[in-house]
Swiss-Prot record:
To M.tuberculosis Rv0039. The chain crosses the membrane at residues 1-21, 48-68. Keywords: Cell membrane, Membrane, Transmembrane, Transmembrane helix. It is a multi-pass membrane protein. It is found in: Cell membrane. It comes from Mycobacterium leprae (strain TN). One of its GO terms (cellular component) is plasma membrane. Its main location: membrane. This is Uncharacterized protein ML0030.
């Protein structure tokens, strides 16, 4: 369980670094940057789950640690999958709204930008 715990903690640190970087990075209108920024909260949540699984793997007995690590890794992967799906939906919806305005801003009452 030492290897599994170490891998979980390392994955948690990497996920937390990428999530924090996405939050600190400057906001732009670029859809790719918006999608990356929208992925920050799921990345931070996955980092917390992986860190918890890693700590349990390092300190608990093997049978308990195996179950907790499996649950934490499954939860982290599920959180990242759901977060990326929501991020993609948000980005596509925002892009569709921006392209459907017709660029006739003189008489428009929408606040596209």
């Amino acid at each position: 369980m030492l290897i599994a715990g170490t891998l979980c903690v390392c994955a948690a640190v990497i996920s937390a670094v990428f999530g924090t970087w996405a939050l600190i990075h400057n906001q732009t209108v670029d859809p790719t940057q918006l999608a990356m920024r929208a992925m920050a909260p799921p990345q931070l949540a996955a980092a917390i789950m992986l860190a918890a699984g890693g700590v349990v793997a390092l300190v608990a007995v093997a049978h308990t640690a195996l179950i907790v690590v499996a649950v934490c890794v499954t939860g982290a992967v599920g959180t990242l999958a759901a977060g990326s799906w929501q991020s993609a939906r948000y980005t596509l919806r925002r892009r569709a709204t921006a392209t459907s305005c017709g660029k006739n801003c003189a008489g428009c009452i929408l606040s596209c930008r």
